[in-house]
Amino acid sequence: MAKGSGRAKAAGGKGGSKQIIATNRKARHNYSIIETYEAGVALQGTEVKSLREGQASLADAFATIDDGEVWLRNLYIPEYQHGSWTNHDPRRNRKLLLHRQQIDRLVGKIRDGNLALMPLSLYFSEGKVKVELALARGKKAYDKRQDLAQRDAQREVVRQLGRRTKGMI
């Protein structure tokens, strides 16, 4: 017997869609991304409820590897508004769920080069909270200026092409 059709999955509301909760825009500006990984996040109940309300901040967040486990530090998830004394600590360290081979590969790459683990986005995928984790290298000031100049040049090219197709030139 077949494992099931995709139509039943879509009807159940569990498609492959992502519902983005928070993004770390500064990470893409301050770091050059080498590789990305998707990791699950071990959360408490009130944290998930707070995330369902769309409340989180990745601004100061980073990941570390301690004793073969990956931890997400400084992720801010505010206390659940309707929670009681069982509410969570908003800045507690949260364990990331990765395969052992992925963790070993990350440990080797971080040890070899001057690399960091940065969270890029936090999202729901099929009802589970996931984080897009990037292996990244810090940019120098001149790298950031080059990126801005390239972006401005690309924007100008698109603007000129738009004028040409509209017959303004």
From Swiss-Prot:
Keywords: Cytoplasm, RNA-binding
Recorded superkingdom: Bacteria
CDD domains: SmpB
Gene3D superfamilies: 2.40.280.10
Cell location: Cytoplasm
One Gene Ontology molecular-function label: RNA binding
Xref: SUPFAM superfamilies: Small protein B (SmpB)
Biological processes, Gene Ontology terms: trans-translation
Cellular component GO terms held in the UniProt record: cytosol
Similarity annotation: Belongs to the SmpB family.
NCBIfam families in the record: PRK05422.1, smpB
Job description of the protein: Required for rescue of stalled ribosomes mediated by trans-translation. Binds to transfer-messenger RNA (tmRNA), required for stable association of tmRNA with ribosomes. tmRNA and SmpB together mimic tRNA shape, replacing the anticodon stem-loop with SmpB. tmRNA is encoded by the ssrA gene; the 2 termini fold to resemble tRNA(Ala) and it encodes a 'tag peptide', a short internal open reading frame. During trans-translation Ala-aminoacylated tmRNA acts like a tRNA, entering the A-site of stalled ribosomes, displacing the stalled mRNA.
Protein name per UniProt: SsrA-binding protein
Organism: Mycolicibacterium paratuberculosis (strain ATCC BAA-968 / K-10) (Mycobacterium paratuberculosis)
